[in-house]
Amino acid sequence: MELFVEKDSIVREIWGKSDTVLFIFAGASAEFALNKAVDWLYFTGKLPSDPLGRLFSTVKYAKSIVFSPKDDANASIDVLRKIHGKVEQNRGTQIPDWAYRDVLFMLIHYSIASYELLETKLTYDEKEEVYNVFHRVGTRMGLSELPLNYKDWLPIRESHLKENLKQSKYTFDLFKQYKKHLGVLRYKVLIEAQKLVVPKHVKKELYLNDFSLLTIVIPIYKFSRNIKIDKFFKNILLPAKYKTEIKELDIHPG
């Protein structure tokens, strides 16, 4: 049975840990809010009405691709494309191709940044492997103009950040929704987490400084994993109604 991502792949290591995945989506939540195509997320109303539920459903989809046999993963990608196609049909216009690429680029960047923050620096080959996996996802979705390798992707990623991110009314509303659904303390943690993984251009657009209070906390959290109390911290940081979803983040299917 051919797997979409090999069992010894660094991508499985990254997406098999709940804390890494949570940092991936902390970063993506900041970048999403600035994307010039963020209005698409408001068209269905799902993200602003339940940002955490949307997060966990997206995680579930990503994990179903990373940890599945190749045929099943491709089928999941095809379904994802059909879902977006239906939204496009309902709105009567197409999601720009660059917007699809932006989402793919987020997954690449934050997979690498989050793992390096919480675990260890990745080798160039490992970064190339991360890029290759998501390149295959993008290719299956029919995206064009995808760089062939990680090295060629880096300057394209930088140009996407400068061209496609800008503050809008949706930016401020989305952060308002984050705060509403997380509460003041958890929202503060989200902001501090974003500071650690978002690119400089995102920080500039969101007026985020370089210092994060989590710089002090992360070494303590890493130690907590060694003595198996990290779940306690996760339960504190996320609302109780998402306990099942939090637990499932550490389940490695396939």
Tell what function each PLM region has.
Residues M1-G254:
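Mature, function-bearing regions of proteins
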